[in-house]
């Protein structure tokens, strides 16, 4: 039957997404101009935020770049922000864009070493609780000195590596180098249950690791971009920052790790999945086969990757350059010394990060709408006019709520600027300023684990190649992050109230 042009256009719009989803996006695009005229730009601005969050929540139905991008373009056309405003937001976050372009690609060229190390760990450590603690604590420790996105890229690379190894074996195609692990058509029926259990197992580890990046990232000056911003305004160096934040960050870290143990013991919130024995055997055999196949050339590659990994950690820990530029150095070193000179081989490394980079620019457009329309101003004004003794906890709560919706750096910038202005005007003391700065820092970092749009690392995980493989949806991430959200928010809030 011949398809009409209008039918073809309808089918092409958002590709293979469900019809209801296409209709919802079209409804958004029709409602928005009407809302601007009838409800005004302020209310419509909040409508745009809700619509964008919806596209993130439906990431498994359609990659958010397309529907979210259409909404962002319309925001500019309707005058809720300007192209200059978007450019300003993008320019302000250029270091994050550089990081995604180059650092994530750099990690791609380290995947052999990462799989080698983590495979040994997974095969040798039998206790799921111990493995979960290792993932969470390692992510926290690394995120205290490296960028959370870099650490998340490592977790994703390891997860995809494990999944592809088992998926090949479960399909009876262990020797097929071109096997597509995104398709389950070839999975042998006997392996279906183990595959689903392995998915749950990897999902648990990735969520523990992702939350670990927040646990570590809050504690040091270089842990998160907003930490640098707050420290600069407050005039704190690395040691000052750590000591000021420690009364909150250290108890939160301890309680976060305790939460890992409780979740794995109780199997609450969909945690507690075990590594099936058949999967462990396959990973064990894979390790033995890889060890037997190792030539001097392969060993040389692993040595180079190990050396470059050390250079990477030292470069980021001492902040010798912007993270993205360090990532570019990693790409050059690994490809040069491991003989990867084919353009197409190099190109594969950028496939994972560039769609997310584009999505992040779309996100910055929504942040620009928030900025231009002063959508957060009423909340900011309420907190700033509260009694002095209740301000720290209210700053913590307000920053947490707003950071779960918007960009952490944007929220931190708004609040720390207002608090600094109050200090300069003599309205608050230096001691109170330091307390509020810690409340702002911990507020933007801890409760924001509630949603994927609250943490760039979470959003990266949600929109990465591994999310559909492990059936990790927006709703699933929110559900699995919920116990952490409660623990981090309550413990963080109590520490801000009583320990500062």
From Swiss-Prot:
Catalytic activity as recorded in UniProt: 2 Na(+)(in) + 3 H(+)(out) = 2 Na(+)(out) + 3 H(+)(in)
Membrane topology qualifier: Multi-pass membrane protein
Chief location category: membrane
Keywords, sorted A to Z: Antiport, Cell inner membrane, Cell membrane, Ion transport, Membrane, Sodium, Sodium transport, Transmembrane, Transmembrane helix, Transport
Listed InterPro entries: Na+/H+_antiporter_NhaB
TM spans (from-to): 13-33, 34-54, 62-82, 97-117, 129-149, 242-262, 306-326, 350-370, 392-412, 449-469, 477-497
Pfam families per record: NhaB
Presence of keyword Amino-acid biosynthesis: no
Localization annotation: Cell inner membrane
Cellular component annotations (GO), alphabetically ordered: plasma membrane
GO molecular function term, any single one: sodium:proton antiporter activity
HAMAP family the record matches: NhaB
Function: Na(+)/H(+) antiporter that extrudes sodium in exchange for external protons.
Family: Belongs to the NhaB Na(+)/H(+) (TC 2.A.34) antiporter family.
Protein name in UniProt: Na(+)/H(+) antiporter NhaB
Gene: nhaB
